[in-house]
Design a protein with these regions (language model features):
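Short secondary-structure junctions
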Residues: 87-94
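Short, internal active-site loops enriched in acidic
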Residues: 101-106
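Helix-start/capping segments and mature chain N-termini
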Residues: 1-73, 77-84, 107-181
Length: 181
């Protein structure tokens, strides 16, 4: 994965990868209040094509509404920003990660009054479990961590806090020698 070269779209500007920084007191870092999407861009005869760009961008805004987060850009602006990140980084295909989160201005649980920031990263993607996973197969484990019941969170919204169990399951699987949990 690309970690230092290229550009990230951050709050309306393309900045060097290492320049996309966030304050340590960012509300979303402390309370898991962020929304994000994961999109694939595929190589086509007409250049890179971002799969279901409009639908993913719409879901980002729908997810933000769950947290009463007002994204300071329009859907059209974020769709163009996602295209710009792919273009600027010279990707024929890859993975995009737009994320919106509350800034550092507020302490405590309620983020009301905090700024909202948006970042979009894109990088080459060889596949979630590696480029040879299809050919070699993968080892999976049923995790001891149960998925939250549908009434305890919002499964249709891409909320960062909703991924805590999945992260624990993935770590448990890896510690047991599996590819995925």
């Amino acid at each position: 994965m690309q970690t230092s070269d290229g550009f990230i779209w951050y709050d309306g500007a393309l900045v060097p990868w290492t320049g996309a920084t966030t304050h340590v007191l960012t509300h979303s870092l402390h309370y898991g209040v962020a929304v994000f999407e994961g999109l694939r861009a595929y190589e086509t005869l007409r250049g890179p094509g971002i799969f279901r760009l409009r639908e993913h961008t719409r879901r980002l805004f729908d997810s933000a509404r769950v947290y009463r987060m007002k994204i300071p850009f329009s859907e059209a602006e974020l769709m163009e920003a996602q295209c710009a990140v792919v273009r600027t980084n010279g990707l024929a295909a890859g993975y995009l990660r737009p994320i919106a989160f509350y800034g550092p201005e507020k302490r405590g649980l309620n983020p009301r009054g905090a700024s909202v920031h948006v970042g979009i990263a894109a990088w080459r993607w060889e596949g979630y479990l590696g480029p040879d996973a299809r050919a070699r197969g993968v080892r999976v484990k049923t995790s001891s961590y149960a998925r939250h019941h549908v009434n305890t969170n919002l499964p249709r919204a891409k909320l960062s806090a909703s991924y805590a169990n999945a992260i624990l399951a993935s770590m448990e699987a890896a510690e047991g020698g599996y590819d995925e949990g």
